[in-house]
């Protein structure tokens, strides 16, 4: 399989590699951009919290496993917003520099922005973001192409403003839901679903 071709081993430190097997080197601003874009792609169906994906967000044991499968946390909303503000301030000071990111990350970034601009409802946006996120994960599961794209800093600063407004709107919704107090976690329940089996025979 792909992971063995690239030399990945369970007991080793496995660095991110390109499709040719070379270790991919990055920098802090690129990592922060990756975090921001991925977290925005994890907004819940109401665009309030950041989805937990069955993890233990904030070390809250009550949200282990199933409760957090469709759950989200407001604490990460605040952290992502703070990161957006920080990166915006830095990029504004160094707007004459250039930033390159892996083409897979840039594709996710473009799809996130397009989804925010075109989706008419919260659920539609959630579905579009989830689809973009899963496509990105499939492409980067074991490696990336190694090709990079140069980002336009003013355009990304504009995107950060959009993300900040989206997160702020989520805080307002959460405060309304909590009668003036901001809830910490949300749990969503699937009311309609289809069971998909990988093995058609059971």
Predicted regions and their residues:
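Acidic, mature catalytic/reactive cores of soluble proteins
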Residues: 1-202
